[in-house]
Amino acid sequence: MENGVLLQGFHWYIKPEEKLWKKLKENVDEYKQLGFSALWLPPAYKGVGGKNDNGYGVYDLYDLGEFNQKGSIETKYGTKVDYLACIQAFQKAGIDVYGDIVLNHKMGADGTEIVNAKEVNRQNTNEIISGDEQIKVYTLFTFPGRNKKYSDFIWHWYHFDGIDYDEKTHRNTIFHF
């Protein structure tokens, strides 16, 4: 197709009770008839806010609405089963599907770690404005609700290059590790 038309299949204010994955699937024929050739889906994984998170508050990339984490099993948009059924319906109709994903940050850690860090200038993060200091950071991600299904990887502070909060002093500033 030379000039396809992409449907953004979501907006910021969708409510969890709208069951987006099911709603999109129910309307796939209408979208095909309207001429859409591709569908853009929001992040499908569990965010820090559980079923109230739009997916951009990244918690667990492997939880697509399957595990009881962050207060819910479902994501804001539904379950893993609903998500996969939605994708399959669009693909069967000949509509390409693009899932959004965020890989550059995480939120809602399962624990804290003590690390050495340096404060940097908010306006120029290349400028270090403090010496080494010990801070307490939320960088330990163990995903206990998933119990190592799909991946046993545990995130630690050294998987990140910085953070914006010190639990020890309750300071909101930018630190580099």
Locate each region found by the language model.
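Substrate-binding/active-site clefts of carbohydrate-active enzymes
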Residues: M1-E26, L34-S37, P43-F177
